[in-house]
Every structure is written in structure tokens, then in C-alpha cells.
Amino acid sequence: MKNVLFVCTGNSARSIIAESIINHSYKDKFKGFSAGSNPSGKINPYIKNFLQKKGFDLEKCYSKNFDEFLNNKIKIDHVFTVCSNAHNEVCPIWPEKKEIIHWDIEDPVKKFKNTNDPNEINDISQLTFDDINSRIEDWIKNEK
């Protein structure tokens, strides 16, 4: 079992989606985690609602700082940054990490601020989910 950490700034949307996809669809090979460099302290309510409607279990999922993963209690095999801010920030040296991969994924939370339309909110969530899911699928195909 390999541990995968997804990092973004707020740990409220993109990294939460990625963690959820890993733990839902690839739980036989991977354990997903997420964290933020400046966590918001909560999962974005639109993303939370979207994932729950898709049947994802978010009981153990919460917004947290990446410092929680620097204590070596959990060996992280792969680290992904899923936003430019997290990629460009001074990130810690990850103990025992195998690789760091950067995916520049557009922030759905910024788009949510421009609408109150439930259909648009769902479309934004779905596009973000599909983007992340596709990247994870491609990465797993090449993961040895």
C-alpha cells in the first residue's frame, strides 16, 4: 500500500477531491491524504456536497496543515501539488518521499464566488473532479 499526499494552499477543494478519489476508487493500492500550506480549516461546502452526492465517504476527511505529515508517522510515497501557489511556496523536505509531481488545477472556489446558480456550481465541481480524476487515472497507469 502506497501513501499519496495532495497539497494545495487552502486544502478545501482540489486536494480534498484528489484524496477522496484515491480513497474511493484506488483503495486497494493507495491511501490518499491531503493538506494545505495555509489550510482554510474546512472543506468547501459545495465540494463537500458534490462528493457526498457521488457517494464518497468524507468522515475522515478534513482541512489540515501539511505539518501533520512531517512527523514520519505516515510514510508518504508520492507528493502532488495541485495548485501553483503550493508548488511555488517554500514546501518542506518530505521525508522518504519518492517523487513530487505538480498539477496546475484551476481553483473551483474562485469560480464559485461568481455564481449562485446550483447548476453552474455543479458544473464547476464536475469539471474540477473530471480533471483531477483523469490526471490520477493517467498517473496510476504509469505507476509501477
Place the predicted regions along the sequence by residue:
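Phosphate-binding/catalytic loops
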Residues: 88-144
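Short glycine-rich anion-binding loops that position phosphate/pyrophosphate groups of nucleotides
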Residues: 10-12, 84-87
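Conserved active-site segments centered on acidic
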Residues: 1-70
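Residues at the C-termini of beta-strands that transition into short coil/loop
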Residues: 36, 83, 104-106
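Alpha-helix C-terminal capping/helix-to-coil transition sites in glycosyltransferase folds
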Residues: 74-75
